[in-house]
Amino acid sequence: PLYSSAASDVYKRQDAFKAAIGDRVAKAMKVKYAFQQLEELPAGFAVPEGRVKPWGTCHAVLAAKDLIDGPFAVINADDYYGPEAFRVMYDYLSTHEDGSYYDYCMVSYLLRNTVSENGSVARGVCVTDPDGTLHSVTERTRIETYENGVHFTEDGGESWTDLPGDTPVSMNLWGFGKSFLDEAEQR
């Protein structure tokens, strides 16, 4: 979904998106559009006075809920996942029953394969069981390489914490059943 705070902006953004990406993708698959509106919130929620920033990924997914009729993936447009990641996601979503409590999936990567020599990156640092069950994701907004490996800071660089290169990280490639939408509306 595309974000807009004014109805007239929706059409400008829609046309720009279609021209840059949508028309090309539409040659290979069916394309539908949903637009993230700041004011469109689940019952019981309100926009705080002065807020102009979009709500985030979950709100964007909820903006598309009327277009979702089965399992679906959520990706960031600014990351490249590679074809294998989409194959893994498809295999999972096409073989799992919807409705299992929190039976969702995420494609993770080894941290060492996702860092840049040209500056910092933001990643979701994952805590998993040995069997791969995800327990938590903590966003680290400034992860950098240095001569001894990889580390992150949360205080503007005053202190750093090392991260092993084999740490699983999220680049926001998630898979859900349609039932996730009900859960998302409650939160």
Predicted stretch roles:
Residues 1-7, 11:
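Single conserved hydrophobic/aromatic residue that forms the stacking wall/gate
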Residues 3, 25-71:
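Short phosphate-binding loop-to-helix
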Residues 15-21:
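Acidic helix N-cap motif at the loop->helix transition within catalytic regions
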Residues 71-80:
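Short beta-strand-to-loop acidic/aromatic patch adjacent to the donor-nucleotide binding site
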Residues 81-82, 176:
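Hydrophobic/aromatic residue at the end of a short beta strand that borders the catalytic acidic motif
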Residues 83-171:
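Conserved core of the sugar-phosphate nucleotidyltransferase
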Residues 173-183:
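Conserved nucleotide-sugar donor-binding
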Residues 185-187:
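A C-terminal functional module that forms or caps the active site or interfaces directly
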